[in-house]
Amino acid sequence: MAKVKMTPSEAMTEVLVNEGVTHVTGILGSAFMDMLDLWPTAGIEFIAVRHEQTAGHMQDAYCRITGKASVCIGQNGPGVTNLVTCVAAANQAHTPMVVLGPSAGTPTVGWDGFQECDQVSIFRSITKQVLQVPHPSRAGDVLRTAFRIAYAERGPVYVDIPRNYFYGEVYEEILRPDQYRAMNVRGAGDATELARATEILAAAKNPVIISGRGVVDADAFAEVKEIAHMLTAPVAMSYLHNDTYPADDELWVGPIGYMGAKSAMYSLQDADVILAIGSRLSVFGTLPQYDINYFPENAKIIQIEVNPKQIGRRHPVTVPIIGDAKLATAELIKLLKAKGDVKPNAERLAKIQERRNDWFKEIEEMAMMPGNPINPRRVLFEVAKLMPEDAILTTDIGNVASTANSYFKFTKPKKHIAALTFGNTGFAYQAGLGAQMAEPDSPVVAIVGDGAWGQSLHEISTAVQYKLPVIACVFRNMAWCAEKKNQIDFYNNRFVGTEIPNPISFIPAAEAFGAKGIRVEKPEDIADAFKQGLAWRAEGHPVVLEFVVDGTILAPPFRKDALALPTRYLPKYEHLDAKYFPKN
């Protein structure tokens, strides 16, 4: 196609259209209004959120579910800096995202003008790459490059656009994505490494599979299940990726990592071979839990990972396979079959069932311990039982939200969207809005602590405006309980900054925004409240369920590895030293 005359705004909009972008999230601003004016005609909906951080979290979840690189935007200066947290979270989640950042106009750069700051430096360390439009004629080209990098490197790319570069006349050729970025070029990996892996797996006595995010991205559910049954290998899910193996399969042993399943950890503890499929084996996701140092030091590790930067990054590997999770696993299946029939190990299967049943019994008993206020585990247990199979769960970070890792199971992929290792609060509800846009017919349930809810409740207004009927399960324990637990265990119950005494209830605020809401104070009312929430959701209403829970029933500290009892040297602080703590 020949080059045609257009404006930079039109050139960038045409790139978005050809990339299949149906919506952009953000808060409008004068810096990009010339391009914004084009979007309704182009078929791109602008979702106007109440805080730019929501824009990025929505698109993070949207991309994780659809696989499509998503786009968010903010006004230069404060609008763009409000995107920092959500972009950093997406970067650690390996989510392809294009972040459009209008910046100060070139004639005034360096004069500390209105809403001017060095946006490029801010985003350099939290994205895969920072790009700048050097001239209006390059606007379309730079945006195409952003999509190319976002897909290739699996993460956000920041595009800095001086606000005067949206205007003018340029000559641009409108290109299809397959003309400027590779589509589906991943392979199964090196044949020699695949052959080595096959020999190790065939000889393994206690192989264990860790199924990670790459399994979902590559649509490798069937392949992982097949190789697991060939090997009678228990399958553990990597940290906060609980939807990477079907929970109704007999080889499912649950997630690892903080508040994961002991059945998974004991299985890994016995492993002589670990087959990590689509997992980077992150440091936080493999730390000891429940005082179980479960990641085996002497096991042989076969790591299938599409990104060579993640191979052997935390744990030394025996066989590195740089390849697509689906294709590499399929090749291993073929090679194992060529070696002859692999018979199921009935004894091992019985052990797996025993460990699963022990874990299910343990977490149910913990949930059914009576309490007033309600035991928070009881809420998680009841809600997990009632979750529709096609529902999507989004989870925040914090004491209760992290405990959800023990209770929720999934039979389908792309059903668990978690805050992951960036660990910011104020994620679950905002991500839930994006998940609801991605799957309008699926119920979306957000698990949120009352601390995180203070950073989220304003977005009920967005949910109502755009008819996104997300169900927020808000746990009202009157405190930042993850940090409270640290002050209990390491600071002798000296509480500073942990309490959240007001409001008495969040429900009046939710109703004022236009949502439906129920405050639940008795355990026997949990199930009925959640069923009512599902009914309201089916009618198109956003829902807030406020569960009043016991703030003294707490999970272990997140970072036992990074905390220590206090030592104090100055006389005026000596009484705070751990040597004066009561002896247990």
Swiss-Prot record:
GO MF annotation, one: magnesium ion binding
PROSITE patterns, alphabetized: TPP_ENZYMES
Group of enzyme by EC: transferase
Catalytic activity entry: acetyl phosphate + sulfite + H(+) = sulfoacetaldehyde + phosphate
Compartmental location: Cytoplasm
Tree of life domain: Bacteria
CC per GO annotation: acetolactate synthase complex
Cofactors (names): Mg(2+); thiamine diphosphate
EC number of this enzyme: 2.3.3.15
InterPro entries membership: DHS-like_NAD/FAD-binding_dom, Sulphoacetald_Actrfrase, THDP-binding, Thiamin_PyroP_enz_cen_dom, Thiamin_PyroP_enz_TPP-bd_dom, TPP-bd_CS, TPP_enz, TPP_enzyme_TPP-bd
Pfam families, A to Z: TPP_enzyme_C (PF02775), TPP_enzyme_M (PF00205), TPP_enzyme_N (PF02776)
Pathway membership: Organosulfur degradation; taurine degradation via aerobic pathway; acetyl phosphate and sulfite from taurine: step 2/2
Coiled-coil stretches: none
Keywords noted in UniProt: Acyltransferase, Cytoplasm, Magnesium, Metal-binding, Thiamine pyrophosphate, Transferase
The keyword Metal-binding appears for this protein: yes
GO BP annotations listed: isoleucine biosynthetic process; L-valine biosynthetic process; taurine catabolic process
Family label: Belongs to the TPP enzyme family.
Subunit-level organization: Homodimer.
NCBIfam families: PRK07525.1, sulphoacet_xsc
The protein's name in its UniProt record: Sulfoacetaldehyde acetyltransferase
Origin organism lineage: Bacteria, Bacillati, Bacillota, Clostridia, Eubacteriales
Gene for this chain: xsc
